[in-house]
Structure formats: C-alpha cells, structure tokens
C-alpha cells in the first residue's frame, strides 16, 4: 500500500508574549518577555491510501497543529508535509493543483460555515472555483451531496443558523467531500455534539468512507471514538508521537506508559467478579506547559516507570512488534 500523505520530520514553533501572571511567576529571564511554544517536535508519519489514521492525545498535545500542517493551513518551521511526494505548501502558498486534494472538517461547524451564505452556495463555491463543475450544474451537484450526508436537498436555500449542530456538521462534511479530496482531515468533528448525535455523524462518516474509499486523518481526544473509525492510531504527547500501531494492538497491547494511562482513564462499565466496577483512573499529574516541556522524555514527570535515563535522554521511536512502534526507554 502506497503512502498518500507523508509528514517528514515536521516541527512547529510559535512565539508568544508571556502573560502578566507568567512574568510575576518569574518566567522572564534571558529569553526576555517572549517564549517559543514547541507545538510539534520532529514528527514523521505516513498515511496510506484508503486508510484512516487516528491521532489521539490530551488537549494541548499538538494534534490539531499537526493536522493543520498536513492540510497546508500552517507552514511548519521544520520538515515538510508531502502528498504523493509533492509539498503541500511551496513558498508559503498552496500549489493550485494540490489545493483540492486535502480538505478539512473542523470541530465547530457554526464557526466554519459562512452565516451569510446559503448552504447551496457554501457547498458549490469551491467546486465551481476550481473547475470541478460548471455553475449551471451546481444545483444538482449540491442536491446530490446533501442527499449523501442525509439531508433534504431543499435545505440548499437555507442558512447555517437554521440547522442543529449535527446538521451543520453534515453540511461541513458535504462541503469538504464536494471538492473530491484525496485526503480528508477531521479535527475533533464530533466533540461539540451531543452523544446521540455523535453516533449518527460517526456512522455517516463510516458509510461515506466505505462508499468513497476515503483516506483520512481523524483527530480526537476520545479513544472510544477513534477506536471505531481508525485502521491505525498514533498517540501524541506534548508535540511528539509516543506510540503508533494498528488499532487492535494499541487497545489490546498498549506499550507506552502514556497510552496505558490514557486507556485506564476511560470509565469502564464492565464489572469485576465481585460485582464492583473498574476504577476510573485519571492520568497522574498535570500536563506540563509547552512553554517549558520536561527534558528527556516529556512524560517522565507523570510516568510510574520513569528512570534517570528518561529525565536526560529523549527516546527514539522504535519498532517493537509488527507494524507497532513506541518511543520509550523500557523497550530500548
């Protein structure tokens, strides 16, 4: 299976001014009143044609930033994002031929849809602009895509505020897929929806994936959601990939202590022999600030297996089983 999308040694840093609270806390030093936020650090990933890669981690781990680099929304400060071996961005701009090949579905559909435009215009504008359809064929094209996402074609004349959150997300999905992309990036697409609506949107996603043979990067903090839609899963912590492998391997035999902690932090309904439920185990400690991440392995302050080596040496991502890699000194 060939790689459609490649992220090669990608890094992303943002410079921000310290807040008054941070200055009072004594963070102002040799670096002055600004600090670099290391959102992504030397990440390399491949997404195979036809697969869905899940990207999982706590809020602030850099997964959304990585998704935006893959989409060409952000230009990385190091490394490159490639689609079929060609840069997604060149000279800070999208090559026109590649613009339609990657599309994104964002977390908040109300913020990502123009409130002053009718749904039909929202869906048809991109395909018309890029010559995928002719303007006179737009009505039928829009009706077809609204039908595919389970909406009435008559909705084309309505505005985004007239729909529920789940319906707006379906419109956002239709807009993205109407561009006929080779890669779809879904950034927390169900996080803002009610649980019952989440299930409907996820089922729609699975149906469209099978029907259109979609290649996807599915970003979420919810392990349960990612498990149902992904072929492989990458676990991310403070800008680094700490584990990567097939979905079943990640859930049945997690290797990295952070992956294990993530799985243990999910409430379980199964009961033990004595009848008591499994304990809910939140991850120990707080997520460190990306302004000043820990040395060595970023997870070592929260890791129950931390050694002195973990504090001083960054672990490399190593293969430990078929198609499974982990960045942990326990497996060195």
Regions found by a protein language model. Give the residues of each.
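ABC ATPase NBD coupling module
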Residues: 31-34, 88-103, 121, 129, ...
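Conserved ABC ATPase "signature" region
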Residues: 24-28, 137-154, 207, 263-264
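A short, proline-enriched helix->beta-strand linker immediately N-terminal to the Walker B motif
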Residues: 178-182
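Conserved ABC ATPase signature
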Residues: 159-163, 167
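Short catalytic/signature loops enriched in Gly
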Residues: 16-31, 36, 246-332
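P-loop NTP-binding/switch modules centered on Walker-like glycine-rich loops
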Residues: 95, 189-193, 197-275
């Amino acid at each position: 299976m060939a790689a459609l999308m490649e992220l090669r040694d990608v890094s992303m840093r943002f410079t921000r001014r310290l807040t008054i609270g941070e200055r009072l806390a004594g963070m102002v030093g040799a670096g002055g009143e600004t600090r670099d936020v290391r959102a992504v650090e030397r990440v390399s990933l491949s997404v195979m044609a036809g697969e869905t890669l899940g990207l999982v981690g706590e809020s602030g781990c850099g997964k959304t930033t990585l998704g935006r680099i893959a989409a060409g929304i952000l230009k990385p400060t190091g490394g490159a994002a490639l689609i079929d071996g060609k840069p997604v961005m060149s000279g800070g701009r999208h090559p026109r031929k590649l613009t339609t090949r990657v599309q994104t579905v964002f977390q908040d559909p109300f913020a990502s849809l123009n409130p002053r435009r009718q749904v039909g215009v929202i869906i048809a504008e991109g395909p018309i602009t890029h010559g995928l359809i002719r303007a006179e064929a737009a009505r039928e094209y829009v009706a077809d895509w609204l039908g595919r996402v389970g909406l009435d074609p008559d909705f084309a004349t309505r505005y985004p505020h007239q729909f529920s959150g789940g319906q707006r997300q379906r419109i956002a999905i239709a807009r993205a897929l109407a561009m006929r992309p080779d890669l779809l990036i879904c950034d927390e697409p169900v996080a803002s929806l009610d649980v019952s609506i989440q299930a409907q949107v996820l089922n729609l996603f699975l149906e469209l994936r099978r029907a259109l043979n979609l290649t996807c990067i599915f970003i979420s903090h919810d392990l349960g959601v990612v498990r149902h839609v992904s072929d492989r899963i990458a676990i991310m912590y403070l800008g680094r990939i700490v584990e990567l492998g097939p979905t079943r391997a990640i859930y049945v035999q997690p290797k990295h202590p952070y992956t294990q902690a993530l799985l243990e932090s999910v409430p379980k309904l199964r009961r033990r022999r004595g009848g008591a439920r499994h304990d809910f185990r939140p991850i120990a400690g707080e997520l460190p600030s990306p302004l000043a991440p820990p040395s060595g392995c970023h997870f070592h302050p929260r890791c129950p297996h931390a050694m002195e080596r973990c504090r001083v040496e960054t672990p490399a991502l190593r293969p430990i089983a078929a198609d499974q890699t982990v960045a942990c000194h326990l497996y060195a």
